[in-house]
A protein has these predicted regions:
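Peripheral, non-AAA+ core regions of ATP-driven protein-machinery
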Residues: 4-14, 18-81, 86-92, 99-115, ...
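P-loop (Walker A) phosphate-binding loop of NTP-binding proteins
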Residues: 96, 121
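Conserved Rossmann-like nucleotide-cofactor binding loop
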Residues: 124
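Conserved SAM-binding strand-loop segment of SAM-dependent methyltransferases
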Residues: 143-145
C-alpha cells in the first residue's frame, strides 16, 4: 500500500482555525502573527458508516421528564453550576497554578454513587492518592488514572462506564492521530472535540481542567471555550486564603454566578456568608471607608471600599487602584474637581477593595467617590450606612439594578441606612422596615447627608 502524504495547513494559535495558506493576519479572528505551519496526515475516505441520527420534535422533548442535575455535595459549587452537574455537559475549569482547581475537582467526587473517573496526566495514581488522603476524599466508586493519551482515556471510559470524568489537565492530554506536542493548539482542539463527543454521546458529565496563560486566559485556542457548555474560573492570590469560583459562561444556568471558598490545609471550605468575611476586620475610626453591596451574579456581597488621599511629594500625583477600574476612578476624580470643587491635581489617591475582590459594577461609583472625598476631607462617615449608585459625568447619581436585593443583604447584616438613587427609591412599592432609605439625585446631595 503506498504511503499517504502529509497535507500542510496553517493553524491559528488564537482561535484554532486552520487555513490552506499562510496569512500575516488570521482571516477568522483578525489576530496578527498567529498562523503556524502544521502537517496533517491524509486519511483515506471511508464509505457511509450508517444512517444519520434522527431528529426529535421539541414538543416531545418538553413533554418528557426534566433532566435531573447531579448534586456535587458542595453547595457553593452547585450554586455556580445552576443546581448541580448536568449529564452530558462539558465543563471547563480554569485558574492559575496552585489556585485549587484539582483540589475542588477531587472534593466533589465522593458525592457520586456511580463510578467516576479522575484522569491526571500530570501525576501518578499514587500521587493523586496522597492528595486525596490529605483532603479526606475516600470513595469506592472513584477510579484514578494517569493516562495521557485521549484514545486510552476513551477506552477506560468504555470499560468503567463512569457518571463523571475529570481530565487534569487538557494541556497534557494528546492524540496519537496528530504529530504535534501535547499542549499545542491542534492537540487541545482535537482532544476537546473528542471529549465533547464523549459527553454528548454517552450522556455523562466531563470536567476539563485548564491552565491560564500570563494574560489570564485559558491556554489553547479560544475555540475550546466556545466548544464547552460551562466555563468556570477560580480566582484568588497568594496574599489571601479565600477563593472565588466564577462562571464566565453557562448554557444551563446564570453566568457570572460566584461561589466563595476558603483555602485550608484540608482543602477548600465553603463560606456561607461572604459579606461577614469581607467586613470582619473593618475599622470604624478612620476616614475614607465606605460599604457597597456588590452583585456577583444573583448574589449580593457587601464589600468595604477604602480610599487614601495624601499630598503628592514627588511631582506627578500617583493613582493606585486595587480591585476597581483605573479609568473609572480617573473619571470620578474629574467629577470631584469639576462638580464639587475638591481639587485632586496635587493629591496621591489610593483605592482598595478589601479582600482582593475585583468589581466592575458601576453601582460602586457612589461608594468610591464618597470614600475618596471622606479621605480628602479627613472626615469620618457613619459606620452603618450603605452607598449605592452609578455616577455620571455631570455628577448625577443614576439608577442601578436590583436595589431591593442589595438592601436586603445590608439589612441582614445590621446596617441601618442606605443612600441610593432617587429614581430607584421612587420605584420601590414598599420600603423594608428597620432600615432608612434616602434617595439622592447627585453626588452633592449624598455628601450633604454624610458630611
Amino acid at each position: 500500500m503506498p504511503q499517504l502524504k502529509s497535507k500542510i495547513v496553517y493553524l491559528c494559535s488564537a482561535c484554532g482555525n486552520d487555513h490552506p495558506k499562510w496569512y500575516g493576519q488570521c482571516p477568522s479572528c483578525n489576530e496578527w502573527g498567529t498562523l503556524g505551519e502544521f502537517k496533517v496526515s491524509k486519511k483515506r475516505k471511508k464509505g457511509n458508516s450508517g444512517l444519520a441520527r434522527d431528529s426529535r420534535k421539541l414538543s416531545d422533548i418538553l413533554q418528557g421528564e426534566e433532566v435531573k442535575r447531579i448534586p456535587t455535595g458542595i453547595a457553593e459549587m452547585d450554586r455556580v453550576l445552576g443546581g448541580g452537574l448536568l449529564p452530558g455537559s462539558l465543563i471547563l475549569l480554569g485558574g492559575n497554578p496552585g489556585i485549587g482547581k484539582s483540589t475542588l475537582a477531587l472534593q466533589i467526587l465522593p458525592a457520586f454513587t456511580k463510578p467516576v473517573l479522575y484522569v491526571s496526566a500530570e501525576e501518578s495514581e499514587e500521587q493523586i492518592g496522597l492528595r486525596a488522603r490529605r483532603l479526606n476524599v475516600n470513595s469506592d466508586t472513584l477510579h484514578l488514572s494517569s493516562e495521557n493519551r485521549i484514545e486510552g482515556i476513551l477506552d477506560q471510559v468504555s470499560l468503567i462506564q463512569p457518571e463523571l470524568v475529570v481530565i487534569d489537565s487538557i494541556q497534557t492530554v494528546f492524540s496519537d492521530a496528530l504529530d504535534s506536542l501535547p499542549g499545542s493548539v491542534s492537540q487541545i482542539r482535537e482532544c476537546g472535540q473528542q471529549l465533547l463527543q464523549l459527553a454528548k454521546q454517552r450522556n455523562i458529565a466531563v470536567i476539563i481542567i485548564g491552565h491560564l496563560t500570563k494574560e489570564g486566559i485559558i491556554a489553547g485556542p479560544k475555540m475550546l471555550e466556545h466548544m464547552v457548555d460551562v466555563v468556570l474560573y477560580i480566582e484568588g492570590d497568594d496574599r489571601h486564603d479565600h477563593r472565588i469560583l466564577r462562571s464566565a459562561k453557562n448554557r444551563f444556568g446564570t453566568s457570572n454566578e460566584v461561589g466563595i471558598f476558603k483555602m485550608e490545609s484540608n482543602g477548600l471550605i465553603e463560606v456561607k456568608n461572604p459579606s461577614e468575611l469581607f467586613l470582619a476586620e473593618r475599622r470604624d475610626d478612620i476616614s475614607g471607608s465606605t460599604i457597597f453591596p456588590s452583585l456577583e451574579g444573583s448574589r449580593p456581597i457587601l464589600v468595604e471600599v477604602q480610599a487614601l488621599v495624601s499630598n503628592a511629594n514627588f511631582g506627578t500625583p500617583q493613582r493606585n487602584v486595587n480591585g476597581f477600574d483605573f479609568k473609572r476612578l480617573a473619571m470620578l476624580l474629574a467629577v470631584l474637581e469639576k462638580r464639587l470643587g475638591i481639587l485632586m491635581g496635587t493629591q496621591d489617591v489610593f483605592v482598595n477593595l478589601v479582600g482582593g475582590l475585583k468589581i466592575d459594577d458601576p453601582a460602586a461609583d457612589l461608594a468610591v467617590i464618597t470614600a475618596v472625598a471622606s479621605s480628602a476631607r479627613d472626615k469620618l462617615l457613619p459606620k452603618s450606612v450603605i452607598l449605592i449608585g452609578e455616577v455620571g459625568l455631570g455628577g448625577e447619581v443614576r439608577s442601578v439594578s436590583r436595589l431591593d436585593t442589595r438592601i436586603n443583604e445590608a439589612k441582614a447584616l445590621g446596617f441601618k441606612s442606605v443612600i441610593a438613587p432617587t429614581a430607584n427609591v421612587k420605584r420601590m412599592k414598599t420600603q423594608p422596615k428597620g432600615i432608612k432609605i434616602s434617595g439622592v439625585t447627585n453626588v452633592g446631595e449624598a455628601f450633604h447627608l454624610l458630611f
